[in-house]
Amino acid sequence: MSSKLVLVLNCGSSSLKFAIIDATNGEEHISGLAECFHLPEARIKWKVDGGKQEAALGAGAAHSEALNFIVNTILAQKPALSAQLTAIGHRIVHGGEKFTSSVIVTEDVIQGIKDSIPFAPLHNPAHLIGIAEALKSFPNLADKNVAVFDTAFHQTMPEESYLYALPYSLYKDHGIRRYGAHGTSHFYVSQEAAKILNKPLGELNVITCHLGNGGSVTAVRNGKCVDTSMGLTPLEGLVMGTRSGDLDPAIIFHLHDAMGMSVDQINTLLTKESGLLGLTEVTSDCRYVEDNYATKADAKRAMDVFCHRLAKYIGSYTALMDGRLDAVVFTGGIGENAAMVRELTLDKLGLLGFEIDHERNMAARFGKSGTITKDSSRLALVIPTNEELVIAQDAARLTA
């Protein structure tokens, strides 16, 4: 089978992750990260041929300068690789209700991404910049750009899952509903779980837990999403690195009325100063929480709240599985590496038949997948995610 090389771009507000992946076998030829955009220390780091390299982009550099560097410096050193590029895949955080699957980028698609900016004000504008710069930098691939939406996998949710108990007109007229996030990751690990269990995806019932600086849980029934913890925005749901997740909405009124905080201040509090950072008042890093759980009250407090919330979601989503749960799957930076998070969470779910195997749990870290429960237990798995591969495969499929 001939190779299908795809450039995968993930543009954030102040960074750009990139990789060149062979969609036929998953081989990663180049990967890198440009970061600190708009700052004096803007830099780019990349790996190629097993070696790591780094360079300054220049003070104030952003997406345009980063893509220019990728094209004119990194790929210029690999002309054969550059000549074999067949498509460009773009990760898009929010596609609203308009996009239920990946699509080739057109003017209509660009407008749809713009229309979803209110629901992803930091991410979607950056994605649009990435698309515009890719179209300029790779004119030969102008009709080979593909948008892959984090929200698409969740578009199979039934109405009872995605509607809020608000006036229905807010949904009909303004699109206020649950959309979810991390859909590409939830889809990937669901596929991998089906392979491990030797079961068709359409018959698979799993609960997938994508745990990183942002985190979400998804109920997958018969291979399709039927509920997910993130909502209109990625603020709802689990305790995250700096995001609060679920809370009583009246707290917002109290912060404003009784404490004099502005809407902008409350937004900053809930999105950038809460979660693990808020609970520890030290850091958003789960490694600190895990390393200091036994000795520091702030770490124990944060870990206990984090795992309590996660266990509640897993427990409640079990009720949506029509009487059969094949597995719980952990993925993402925390899900793949924080053995303590997995153990403390599953220990709360003994009633559902989970019993952790300590040795297996400790072994399934640092990129290693595997079963983490005892043979007599209900199954829990660690499966490292690979969102970039899904994006590359979708881009290759749609542009074939």
From Swiss-Prot:
Enzyme class: transferase
CDD domains: ASKHA_NBD_AcK_PK (cd24010)
Cell compartments where the protein resides: Cytoplasm
InterPro entries cross-referenced by the UniProt entry: Ac/propionate_kinase, Aliphatic_acid_kin_short-chain, Aliphatic_acid_kinase_CS, ATPase_NBD
Keyword Nucleotide-binding: yes
Gene3D superfamilies in UniProt: 3.30.420.40
GO cellular component: cytosol
Residues bound to substrate: R91
Keyword terms, alphabetized: ATP-binding, Cytoplasm, Kinase, Magnesium, Metal-binding, Nucleotide-binding, Transferase
Catalysed reactions listed for this entry: acetate + ATP = acetyl phosphate + ADP
Annotated site, Transition state stabilizer, chain positions: H182, R243
EC number annotated for this UniProt entry: 2.7.2.1
Residues the record marks as active site: D150
Family: Belongs to the acetokinase family.
Subunit structure, as described in the record: Homodimer.
HAMAP family noted in UniProt: Acetate_kinase (MF_00020)
Known role: Catalyzes the formation of acetyl phosphate from acetate and ATP. Can also catalyze the reverse reaction.
Listed name of the protein: Acetate kinase
Gene: ackA
